[in-house]
Swiss-Prot record:
EC numbers, comma separated: 3.1.3.87
Keyword entries, A-Z: Amino-acid biosynthesis, Hydrolase, Methionine biosynthesis
Catalytic activity: 2-hydroxy-5-methylsulfanyl-3-oxopent-1-enyl phosphate + H2O = 1,2-dihydroxy-5-(methylsulfanyl)pent-1-en-3-one + phosphate
GO BP annotations, alphabetical order: L-methionine salvage from methylthioadenosine; L-serine biosynthetic process
Enzyme class of the recorded protein, top EC level: hydrolase
GO molecular function per UniProt: 2-hydroxy-3-keto-5-methylthiopentenyl-1-phosphate phosphatase activity; L-phosphoserine phosphatase activity; magnesium ion binding
Name of the molecule in the record: 2-hydroxy-3-keto-5-methylthiopentenyl-1-phosphate phosphatase
Domain of life from the UniProt record: Bacteria
Pathway membership, UniProt: Amino-acid biosynthesis; L-methionine biosynthesis via salvage pathway; L-methionine from S-methyl-5-thio-alpha-D-ribose 1-phosphate: step 4/6
Species for this entry: Bacillus pumilus (strain SAFR-032)
């Protein structure tokens, strides 16, 4: 029997909008748009693009950026209930985020433990924001992911695990290639279709939960736990 493991993106997945894009639109000079486009067309890596975007912002903007994000972030419907449901089933749940710790941690406070969150670190010690990459690509990845989701998945999972990825964007494509099943929407949905990856479409965590409970490996895992509880 395979053990289900859930790996979930943050920006545009847990939250309704991409917080990095929101930050750039509100605080950054116009140069950020070319960096974004260059990432999407793969002219530069995600790590290069995101790092350079944040270098456009001054470190003394930290509090303003944090307040802007925390005051206006919308969590996708059903997320907390889904996390509680997964935890109750004793299924590991990890957040793999290309976002920054100074806004990811506060948003997920009380829902996901920090040790289960993998994201980038923003440093405010220099004039402009510098991004540090504690979860950069391992020896098996040369894509310059920044927060390398495939590398984290390799670190977290074992051969007999059933990996479920939840995502929406370009930063989730490589992770989806390593998953047994991907819940996808938006850009990632189109990529899954084009690449022939096993996937299901979702819009909220409410409909995702309904589909999640029908996955064969999840049902088998839940049945095993129920039987063990009775014995």
């Amino acid at each position: 029997m395979k053990k289900p493991i859930v790996c979930c993106d943050f920006d545009g997945t847990i939250t309704k909008n991409d917080n990095i894009i929101r930050i750039m639109k509100h605080f950054a000079p116009s140069e950020w748009t070319k960096l974004k486009d260059d990432v999407l067309t793969k002219e530069i890596t995600i790590q290069e693009g995101v790092g350079q975007m944040f270098q456009l912002l001054k470190s003394d903007q930290k509090e303003a950026i944090q307040s802007f994000i925390l005051e206006d972030t919308e969590i996708r419907e059903g997320f907390k209930q889904f996390v509680d449901h997964v935890k109750k089933a004793d299924i590991p749940f990890y957040v793999l985020s290309g976002g920054m710790d100074f806004f990811v941690y506060p948003i997920l406070e009380g829902i996901v433990e920090r040790e289960d969150i993998y994201c980038n670190h923003a440093s405010f010690h220099e004039e402009h924001i510098q991004i540090e990459w504690p979860h950069a690509c391992d020896s098996q990845c040369q894509n310059g992911c920044g927060c390398c989701k495939p590398s984290i998945i390799r670190e977290l999972t074992r051969e007999n695990d059933f990996i479920i990825m939840i995502g929406d964007s370009v930063t989730d494509v490589e992770a989806a290639k390593h998953a047994d099943l991907t819940f996808a929407r938006d850009y990632l949905l189109n990529e899954c279709k084009e690449l022939g990856l096993v996937h299901k479409e979702y819009e909220t965590f409410i409909d995702l939960k309904a589909q999640f409970d029908q996955i064969k490996e999840v049902k088998e895992w839940q049945t095993k736990r129920t039987s063990a509880g009775r014995s």
